[in-house]
Swiss-Prot record:
The active site is at residues 332, 438. Keywords: Cobalamin biosynthesis, Glutamine amidotransferase. GO terms for molecular function: ABC-type vitamin B12 transporter activity; catalytic activity. PANTHER family: COBYRIC ACID SYNTHASE (PTHR21343:SF1), DETHIOBIOTIN SYNTHETASE (PTHR21343). The keyword Methyltransferase does not apply. Belongs to the CobB/CobQ family. CobQ subfamily. This is Cobyric acid synthase. It comes from Clostridium botulinum (strain Eklund 17B / Type B). Pathway: Cofactor biosynthesis; adenosylcobalamin biosynthesis.
Amino acid sequence: MNKKNIMFLGTASSVGKSTLVAALCRVLKNEEFKVAPFKAMNISLNSYVTKDGAEMGRAQVVQAEACKLEPNALMNPILLKPSGGHTQVIVNGKVYDNIEPYKYKELNKKLKGIVKESYDKLSNKYELIVLEGSGGCAEINLKDSDIANMNMAESVDAPVILVADIDRGGVFASIVGTLELLSKNERSRVKGVIINKFRGEKQHFEAGVKQLEEIIKIPVLGVMPYEYFDIEDEDAVTEKICNKESEDENSIDVAIIRLSHMSNFTDFNVLSRINGVNVRYVESTKYLKNPDVIIIPGTKNTIEDLRILKESKLADEIIKLHDSGTLVLGICGGYQMLGKILLDQQGVEGNTLQEEGLGLLDIKTRFNERKITKQVEAQVVSNLKDINEIENKSLVGYEIHNGISKVGKNVKPFIKDSKGKIIGVCDIEGSVAGTYLHGIFDSEEFTNAFINALKKNNNFDLLEDDELNKISDYKNEQYEKLAKIFSENVDVDKIKEIIGI
């Protein structure tokens, strides 16, 4: 079979392109096509580390999982991670440069060939590629340097499906306006439209769809309902990241500090799915209250977020709660914040050369330009205070950080990797702990023991033995649900005809 492809472009950002690409990927995979996703450029702080230590955007990880594939950085050759006044540029999984935002156009011209090369390598492995654009596809001020939208479609000769979001309003104008801003050749590449996030009865919308088709002379291939799919989000601007109070008094209260540059918030997806666990994201002292555990997550700008914590008085409140017995846990940047001091003599994060930490752990962190990105197998080597059954539990996760932390005398190892290297410590009493390991709660035995210890401390009912096994199956069930709803509401046969399969 000849290599085939199709590309989903959007009328704007956040119209649902990533989700619809994942949906089509699972539909085609279920029909036994060798399909893979591709997005030239992603802008996100929520990244993933592949088995070979390459960094890529989460959206393509989700799409790879929908294809039942191991994620590969070829699927997302360029990842931009904004941080303060500059952006870290990841190319083919490795740090390429740090640039000011006004240099994007110049950067894109340099990377155009790399993007095409990555696509070609991926295309040689699979019979069908489903591409995703970035943001809106008709940004005329960016058109000359575009490498992620219509220019990408043209370079690989991909037919285009235009995606629009009706929930934000003005869907007809956004579709017509987008097409109007495309050139004649670009517009001829658009073979269909999908209207996403529809609420209400479709029969009341049919007349509008017919009128739209008469105006644009392009078929509307489907109207996707506004439906909740519990799959990982690319960006932190999501309904999941909120301070949601539990209605169940018998639930464990997990307060995650919502940092301004919070990254890898997918670390906590499993926790949010466990019955009897309430996960809240807190950004002010008003809402911190008295949780069972406080977690300081990862961040793209540790020092700046630490300063914001201090200015907001959240830092003082975290220390106060710790002193009164609340367990505090830090992950990656949050781990660094728990230490005595953070040193940035090379200006990796910005212009602040050093900043005092919260002082809860006897560690000192020094930032350097070399970025550590690797998947890790590890083991918990110490229990924590009132968390007595996590020692010797196995962990699988990943590291992604610039800082190196020197361990002092007043802490003990909490987590070691398979080579015996310390990648997390706790204080002698076990009342505060931190680690560089992302994804620790994805390890079922550890999470089961951790949550049950908290439940036991509160005299709550413990988790069922198969509770977390159900969670493991849950993700695949969500992909199947997505594929089913896509197939029921979108003309998949027409899409296959457009692709040529």
